[in-house]
């Protein structure tokens, strides 16, 4: 049986660029990394729920804003990861090191600017977006938003370092850093929220301490670890270089634009979701927390696509990029189906961690049934394919598709279905499933063509620039 599995995986995944052992070896740490991130978030949300429904609602309202900042930061780092992966595929070690340093520099700069703006405008942001919310909820939301904005500055070097590790395919050490941050965050949350009853303040303090440990882990990987895959010199991080910043910017701007408008749409959905009542908002918060944990393996496959496709493109092997693009989507279907089947029998116990009220629990179950049905059927293609296109440099198409489907279906149709037609929070989740269907179709059309494979990689773009 073992010989058959090895032979099958060799036939499916092994090429002259990667062996199946390398692919699986990169995937497993990524899945574990994403699972720990989402599982710790799930457990923390359940801890916050012990402080009352106001706290859960406040965190839910702020999460899309916080997530937007985080994803803009991650978007530019993803652009950096593509650059790093392409240089890695080309075999240029010095360029890889310089690209890692520049990615971290960019991450720190962009995060600091965004976080300070949100910190000083936190009161106005909450009033504008969630003025209809209850007074107690708004007070907690303002505190949480301001605190999380400052916390993200501490997290910026760790995000850049993670992009470097993913770009070179060293997901094992990235997992170690992620485990340090997330496990310590869980224990700090346990102390400050459950034992000391510090509510929102406890969550913020836990984030601060855990992300400080993450900062120390980045220093270790970058400057102390001997023979590390991302070891760099300090000047490679402190002195900005035009050619790298230009490449990171070229790939990062479409990513970040997508995140701004995508999460802006999520915030708008949250703002009209408030009109459906606290029960609907709380049910959405719980269902979304569980759902994002289920989503973790797909995110892992998508991140793997950045490394694999990026290195194939950097090596000039566009034929392999096409092959692996298809294989990774299939891998996404296998992984998510297996994971949903494993988690499904445990859902009842997981939901009880949130101490939901009976009516909230009833609505939560409905949302999860809608979400999981669409997830297994449509999410692998709609999630993994954009990573493949971006890793090849085709960032604008994936951004355009994501924005049109998000604003047209989830925001526009979601408002009509939930508010105007009166189908409530269930209507919003049904629209999410429709969005995944449309995304899958549009990305499949692009993948079957050749335009995404004709984009210049960073080596070709650099050579063209030198000629000019």
Predicted features and spans:
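Small-residue-rich hydrophobic transmembrane alpha-helices
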Residues: 45, 56-116, 155-174, 270, ...
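Helix-terminus/linker motif at the lipid-water interface of multi-pass membrane proteins
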Residues: 38-57, 126-135, 191-198, 260-293, ...
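Short alpha-helical transmembrane segments in multi-pass integral membrane proteins
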Residues: 1-30, 84-151, 193-253, 309-375, ...
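N-terminal transmembrane alpha-helices
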Residues: 14-46, 50-51, 67-79, 111-115, ...
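Short runs within selected transmembrane alpha-helices of multi-pass transporters and secretion channels
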Residues: 77, 147-166, 174-185, 203-219, ...
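Transmembrane alpha-helix boundary and packing residues in multipass membrane permease domains
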Residues: 30, 34, 45-46, 63, ...
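Transmembrane helical elements of multi-pass membrane transporters/channels
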Residues: 25-44, 147, 181, 210-214, ...
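Small-residue hotspots at the loop-to-helix junctions and early N-terminal turns
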Residues: 53-64, 141, 145, 204, ...
């Amino acid at each position: 049986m073992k010989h058959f599995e090895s032979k099958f995986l060799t036939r499916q995944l092994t090429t002259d660029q990667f062996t199946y052992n390398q692919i699986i070896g990169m995937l497993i740490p990524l899945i574990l990394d994403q699972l720990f991130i989402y599982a710790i978030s799930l457990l923390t949300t359940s801890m916050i729920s012990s402080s009352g429904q106001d706290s859960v609602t406040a965190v839910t309202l702020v999460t899309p804003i916080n997530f937007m900042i985080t994803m803009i930061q991650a978007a530019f780092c993803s652009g950096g990861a593509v650059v790093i992966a392409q240089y890695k595929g080309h075999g240029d070690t010095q360029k890889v090191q310089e690209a890692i340093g520049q990615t971290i520099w960019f991450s720190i700069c962009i995060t600091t600017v965004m976080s300070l703006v949100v910190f000083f405008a936190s009161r106005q942001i909450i009033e504008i977006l969630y003025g209809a919310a209850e007074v107690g909820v708004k007070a907690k939301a303002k505190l949480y938003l301001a605190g999380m904005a400052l916390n993200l500055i501490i997290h910026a070097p760790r995000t850049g370092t993670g992009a470097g590790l993913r770009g070179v395919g060293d997901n094992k050490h990235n997992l170690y850093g992620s485990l340090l941050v997330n496990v310590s965050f869980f224990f700090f949350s346990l102390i400050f929220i459950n034992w000391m009853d510090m509510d929102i303040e406890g969550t913020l303090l836990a984030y601060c301490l855990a992300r400080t440990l993450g900062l120390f882990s980045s220093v270790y990987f970058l400057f102390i670890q001997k023979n590390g895959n991302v070891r760099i010199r300090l000047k490679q991080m402190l002195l900005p270089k035009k050619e790298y910043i230009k490449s990171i910017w070229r790939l990062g701007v479409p990513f970040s634009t997508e995140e701004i408008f995508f999460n802006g749409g999520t915030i708008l959905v949250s703002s009209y979701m408030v009109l459906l009542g606290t029960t609907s908002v709380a049910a959405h918060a719980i269902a979304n927390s569980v759902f994002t944990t289920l989503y973790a393996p797909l995110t892992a496959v998508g991140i793997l696509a950045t490394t694999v496709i990026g290195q194939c493109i950097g090596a000039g092997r566009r034929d392999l990029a096409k092959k692996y693009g298809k294989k990774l989507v299939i891998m996404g279907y296998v992984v998510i189906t297996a994971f949903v089947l494993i988690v499904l029998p445990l859902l009842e116990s997981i939901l009880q961690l949130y101490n939901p009220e009976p009516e909230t629990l009833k609505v939560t179950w409905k949302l999860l049934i809608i979400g999981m049905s669409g997830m297994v059927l449509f999410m692998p293609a709609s999630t993994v394919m954009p990573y493949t296109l971006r890793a090849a440099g085709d960032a604008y198409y994936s951004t355009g598709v994501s924005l049109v489907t998000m604003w047209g279906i989830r925001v526009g149709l979601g408002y009509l279905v939930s508010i105007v037609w009166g189908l409530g929070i269930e209507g919003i989740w049904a629209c999410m499933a429709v969005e995944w269907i449309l995304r899958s179709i549009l990305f499949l059309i692009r993948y079957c063509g050749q335009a995404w494979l004709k984009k210049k990689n960073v080596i070709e773009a650099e050579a063209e620039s030198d000629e000019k």
